[in-house]
UniProtKB/Swiss-Prot annotation:
It catalyses: guanosine(37) in tRNA + S-adenosyl-L-methionine = N(1)-methylguanosine(37) in tRNA + S-adenosyl-L-homocysteine + H(+). Keywords: Cytoplasm, Methyltransferase, S-adenosyl-L-methionine, Transferase, tRNA processing. This is tRNA (guanine-N(1)-)-methyltransferase. The gene is trmD. Coiled coil: none annotated. Disulfide bonds: none annotated. GO terms for molecular function: tRNA (guanine(37)-N1)-methyltransferase activity. S-adenosyl-L-methionine binds at residues 118, 138-143.
Length: 252
């Protein structure tokens, strides 16, 4: 049976998610039936004419906090729509586990996700304690809400669904998939502004091309994200290729 993913999103700005439902790889996955993406707006679960979803924080301080009841109403309908699927509830939060490719692979194993996109100063902690299974962050910086992180997560996970990408090997060759940054890529023309495409890529020798790409990925990772190499065990071939890359760089 083909792997499919059901995603429900709780957000006061559901229109933002048209950026992934209507465009790109995620849109194609929706059309192919690989991805189901549905949004619920907490404002639809309020009882006042202003559709208020936030209130002042107890203890004072700046900003507002999202209220529990509208979030619970939206979450209840999302759970119901998930049907018999076991849906993991995720809150996009700066306090959460940082999203890496390894984490993306974990999430891609789920059959259903419900993403809570907060706003303002955050959401009432009691909602998190009662309903949230995991908190995830996309980085140590401040955004205006959880919508963009939620879209990042959906895009990253969708890429791992079999059939979502145009080429079966595309996801495996992405940066971080094997713990390394990606190698450089080139297309026509062969010469641009006196810069030539590396000869090995024109050689037609698949083994030489594979080794060159691996060496470039290792070298680029060593130069730009050496921390990734600290948590990755290099094979004998990789150690040799990296040492050769560093030697060539020092000699140039």
């Amino acid at each position: 049976m083909d792997k499919r993913l059901w995603v429900g999103v709780v957000s006061i700005f559901p229109e933002m998610f048209r950026a992934i439902s209507d465009y790109g790889i995620t849109s194609r996955a929706v059309k192919q039936g690989l991805l189901t993406l549905t949004c619920w707006n907490p404002r639809d679960y309020t009882e006042d004419r202003h559709q208020t979803v936030d209130d002042r924080p107890f203890g004072g301080g700046p900003g507002m906090v999202m209220k529990i009841k509208p979030l619970e109403g939206a979450l209840a309908d999302a759970r119901q729509a998930a049907g018999g699927r076991k849906a993991k509830v995720i809150y996009l939060s700066p306090q959460g586990r940082q999203l890496t490719q390894a984490g993306v692979r974990e999430l891609a194993e789920e059959e259903a996700l419900i993403l809570i996109a907060g706003r303002y100063e955050g959401i009432d902690e009691r909602f998190i304690e009662e309903h949230v299974d995991e908190e995830w962050s996309i980085g140590d910086y401040v955004l205006s809400g959880g919508e963009l992180p939620a879209m990042v997560l959906v895009d990253a996970v969708t890429r791992l669904l079999p059939g979502a990408l145009g080429h079966a090997d595309s996801a495996e060759e992405d940066s971080f998939t094997d713990g390394l940054l990606d190698c450089p890529h080139y297309t026509r023309p062969e010469v641009y502004a006196d810069k030539r495409v590396p000869e090995v890529l024109l050689s037609g020798n698949h083994e030489h091309i594979r080794r060159w790409r691996l060496q470039q990925a290792l070298g680029r990772t060593w130069e730009r994200r050496a921390d990734l190499l600290d948590s990755r065990s290099l094979s004998g071939e990789e150690q040799k290729l990296l040492a050769e890359y560093i030697r060539q760089r020092d000699d140039s």
